[in-house]
A protein has these predicted regions:
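N-terminal segment of the mature soluble domain
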Residues: 31-76
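Acidic/histidine-rich, surface-exposed loop or edge segments in extracytoplasmic proteins
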Residues: 29-35, 129-133
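C-terminal motif of bacterial Sec signal peptides marking the signal peptidase cleavage site
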Residues: 16-19
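Bacterial N-terminal signal peptides that target proteins for export
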Residues: 1-9
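C-terminal/domain-edge helix-coil "capping" segments
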Residues: 131-161
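Surface-exposed short loop/turn segments
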Residues: 71-116, 120-138, 150
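Sec/Tat-exported extracytoplasmic proteins
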Residues: 52, 56, 103-107, 127, ...
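Bacterial signal peptide processing site
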Residues: 21-24
Length: 161
């Protein structure tokens, strides 16, 4: 196959994919331009602000009448034993990350109900690999915070539509 044929086939495939409505996964178009983040400063607040800014949403004070107000009420992490070995040693842990929040739109008089976002992961544990398992747990916690940001962003989108 020569170069022209390869380019033609690539173009044909690209046309077929775009004509069926396919698009890369990512953040959707934002239906609001201003938001106020209120309440507690959580461990993921800084990254949430980055996501909002990258989507061209201005973070303003509540007194500036934002289109949407989000109150971050709190967060909590939990770790519990999922399974034990025959000798009574921990084999698996389950970790949770929860964020409590509520939303108020510009046209509503009161805050919406308190919502909870929860993410969960489990991982194996071994006393012989303590350092690597601690690093794995740290990475899983970071992953859960990022998932919570994505989920909160999606909930904000749903409330504004």
């Amino acid at each position: 196959m020569n170069t022209i044929q390869k380019k033609f086939i690539a173009l044909l495939i690209l046309l077929m994919i775009t004509s069926c409505g396919f698009h890369m996964r990512g953040m959707t178009e934002i239906s609001f331009k201003t938001i106020s983040l209120e309440g507690k400063e959580l461990s993921f607040t800084k990254n949430l602000k980055k996501v909002l800014n990258s989507n061209k949403v201005a973070i303003v004070l509540p007194s500036e009448n934002p289109e949407l107000r989000v109150e971050l009420i709190g967060e909590e992490s939990e770790k519990r034993i999922l399974s034990l070995s025959g000798q009574g040693l921990v084999r698996e842990y389950e970790i949770f990350y929860r964020v409590r929040y509520r939303i108020k739109t510009a046209d509503s008089e009161t805050w919406g109900q308190e919502n909870i976002l929860e993410t969960r992961r489990d991982f194996t544990y071994s006393d012989s690999n303590v350092i690597s398992k601690e690093e794995e747990e740290r990475q899983l916690n970071e992953s859960m915070r990022n998932e919570a940001i994505t989920n909160l962003f999606n909930q904000i989108q749903l409330n504004k539509k």
